[in-house]
Amino acid sequence: MKNFAIIGVGGYVAPRHLKAIHETGNNLIAAYDTSDSVGVLDSYFPATSFFTEMELFDRHCTKAKNRGERLDYVSICTPNYLHDAHTRYALRLGSDVICEKPLVLNPWNLDGLQQVEEQTGHTVNNI
């Protein structure tokens, strides 16, 4: 069983991620979106901690990691222009990443992401 977090849980693609995480028997420990999407989230993971502020989401995930809890994957379901920043954040948090297409808007940003992968030892999976 893997532990997941999701960034952009209020987006139109997020329910597919929630469904996949749920149907494969994994846990969702935290979810973030700038708008309240608890109705969708609650249909799959009613006990998941939900945040509308990135700072609080980050604090929650960091504290969980410091307690020895694994955060295996972060799913990125935000608007395209945020994928690069959120992917870098998740890698630096110490998690592998599942990110919707496109991974970056500008191809030259791929080299930077690859460097962060190498620095952290974690990987990005683009779907």
Labelled PLM ranges:
Residues 1-46, 69:
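N-terminal Rossmann-like dinucleotide-binding module
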Residues 5-7, 98, 125:
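Conserved hydrophobic packing residues within short motifs/helices of P-loop NTPase cores
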Residues 29, 51, 125:
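General small-molecule cofactor/ligand-binding pocket signal
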Residues 30, 72-73, 123:
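Short, Asp-centered acidic motifs that coordinate Mg2+ and/or phosphate
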Residues 44, 67, 118-120:
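Short, structurally constrained coil/turn elements
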Residues 49-116:
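Beta-loop-alpha module in the N-terminal Rossmann-like domain of NAD(P)-dependent dehydrogenases
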Residues 112-127:
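Rossmann-fold dehydrogenase core element
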